[in-house]
Amino acid sequence: MICAVYKSRLKPDSYLFVEKRNDFERVPEPLMKMFGTPELVMLLPLNKREQLALADIEKVKVELAEKGYYLQLPPPPVNLLEEYKKEIGYSRD
């Protein structure tokens, strides 16, 4: 299975995986509006890979088969202040 991976120009670090290059027919219109004009990053042979950097490859394959697309969003930012407060045991109580 080869899929096309596109990055968003509007949403940093957001990627859209689709079954075929330039085929966005199964991607919902509201998602396409939010994503903006897709920019092709690569064609990716999923059957030759065991893992992906930030996504579960099996989930990607299932969603491509069922929905025709997979949306990869960036992980939420780490709140370093909150992490530090936990580390030192700070509590407002």
Swiss-Prot record:
InterPro entries: YcgL-like_sf (IPR038068), YcgL_dom (IPR027354). Residues 1-85 form the YcgL domain. It comes from the Bacteria. SUPFAM superfamilies: YcgL-like. PANTHER family: PROTEIN YCGL. This is YcgL domain-containing protein Shew_2183. The lineage of its organism: Bacteria, Pseudomonadati, Pseudomonadota, Gammaproteobacteria, Alteromonadales.
